[in-house]
UniProtKB/Swiss-Prot annotation:
Gene3D superfamilies: 1.10.287.310. This is Large ribosomal subunit protein uL29. The keyword Protein biosynthesis does not apply. It comes from the Bacteria. The keyword Ribonucleoprotein applies. Belongs to the universal ribosomal protein uL29 family. One of its GO terms (molecular function) is structural constituent of ribosome. InterPro entries: Ribosomal_protein_uL29, Ribosomal_uL29, Ribosomal_uL29_CS, Ribosomal_uL29_sf. One of its GO terms (biological process) is translation.
């Protein structure tokens, strides 16, 4: 639980551009992991799929919260 709270605190401190970069980097890493799993007969740590997806979702939620605060 501590790591998740630290990640949320770090994400809340980031600007919108930094959040976009974080989301982009995580999407690239998720794509690379999927490609590695599909194209190579290599063992992939499957729990990483959900970790990347959850990190992306958290960043998108925080980005939306910031947008609502500005326009709300």
């Amino acid at each position: 639980m501590g790591a998740k709270k630290n990640l949320l605190a770090e994400l809340r401190e980031k600007s919108s551009e930094e959040l976009d970069e974080f989301i982009r980097d995580n999407k690239k890493a998720l794509f690379a992991l999927r490609a590695e799993a599909a194209l190579q007969n290599k063992v992939v740590k499957t729990h990483q799929f959900s970790l990347y997806k959850k990190s992306i979702a958290r960043a998108l939620i925080i980005k939306q919260e910031k947008k609502d605060r500005v326009h709300g």
